[in-house]
Amino acid sequence: MSLPRFMIAAPASGSGKTLITCGLLQALVDRGLRVASFKCGPDYIDPMFHSRVIGARSKNLDAYFVDTPTLRYLFGRTAEQCEVSVVEGVMGFYDGVDFTVTDASSYDVSEKLDIPVILIVNSRGASLSTLAVLKGFKDFRPNRIAGVIFNQMSQKVYDALAPEAERMGVKPLGYVPKLKDLVLESRHLGLVLPGEVEELRDKLKRLGQELERTVDIDGILEMARSASDLDYSAPAVGRIDGTVRIGLADDDAFCFTYEDNIELLERCGAEIVRFSPIHDAHLPDVDGIVLSGGYPELHGEELESNRTMLDDIRDAIASGMPCIAECGGFMYLHERMEDRDGVERRMVGAIPGRTWNTGKLCRFGYVTLRPADEGGMMGSRPVVKGHEFHYWDSESNGTDWEASKRGTTYRCINDTGTMLAGYPHLYYYSNPEVPLGFLRRCAEYRDSKD
């Protein structure tokens, strides 16, 4: 199948990938094109920026979480609905899950999906040296680097260097000058949330217009359309009998949700009912709850003041309604949560004790997980992959699942049989038996109400 596509990658983080990706997305949307966007790796925040531009939820592509056929499916089923797909890389182009491998890197994804790559080379404080960087990346190993955009470069320098890049076999596709008033600010958990960037839409609009002036958008589209055909098929997954209604927390406090997780729940028999623990007075009529990650610590007062919602969720869990809670959602289930200002807030109370800010990164990175025994929600011991990134710690991290990463094994997650709650974010397509096991519990709860 013909799926026009290209990847924006860079030698390192901080090169301007997200800024330029958002600008290109805006320019393509302004041309009236139907655009799909993707982010390599497990990051939630960059796709949220993409979504503000394209008006639809952006997706993740992670070669650590899934095998190649599944990766191709997750890409293809969205890309086929659009005229062009834009993939933003992660970290440095060749940086993988360990220091000396390219597994799960942007490079790995580009190879598995046959994507032409445009390298963003940050030229701040350099001129000719940027070509040495470009040549090094081009020659490091066989790759799909087909074009280059120079960031923080003047037109005068670009005009001098572009012919040299072309002689290397890399198409020069333009430059981005220094744009002090169009910077997307950073903070402790990556980029700020889209809703917190003042006048973001105006910024992105102006950014798209600037890139139309200095970047060869037509050349990028030509490159995207030259990508080879990509075949894919949907992986087989199980399905429960009938349908269960799943309440999905979805607001400014609980906004870290993989759209592919939601799609898989639907394939397995879920009807998704989105609700807001901040704004809605009551939990909707559902058979199960998914409390996503996010930033509950930024909304502690609002969450605490919504007593009817807190009571509804506590009572539902106590009655046996199945619940999966990850990171921020796990924090919300505690008796008490320290907010960003150090104020201790009363929360749901389904998890004993408190969660507090340690002032440092507690855990970070990919993790492989499985139940410690067969007595929990899954009724077996399926292996599932996920990732962790949190500054808050808990008095009740749980010991019901085993986690492993880089040769280290530790216990985590509270698994009561109907409640699965802990800091790790799970990626369902890494093992569809996990969401299916959750929905089976939800179906049992549904039937118990009849």
Region locations from a protein language model:
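Phosphate-binding active sites in nucleotide-utilizing proteins
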Residues: V244-A318
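Cysteine-nucleophile active-site neighborhood
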Residues: P296-D373
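Structural motif
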Residues: M7, V86-E88, I118, I149, ...
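ATP-dependent carboxylate-amine ligase catalytic core
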Residues: S2-L19, L25-L113, V121-R144, Q155-D159
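C-terminal and late-domain segments of enzyme folds
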Residues: R213, I240-G242, F254-L264, E271, ...
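A short helix->loop->beta-strand "cap" motif at the edges of active sites that frequently abuts
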Residues: I115, V170, A318-P322
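Residues that mark the start of a beta-strand
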Residues: R5, L33-A36, T243-R245, E271, ...
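Internal gly/pro-rich beta-alpha loop/helix module
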Residues: S127-G238
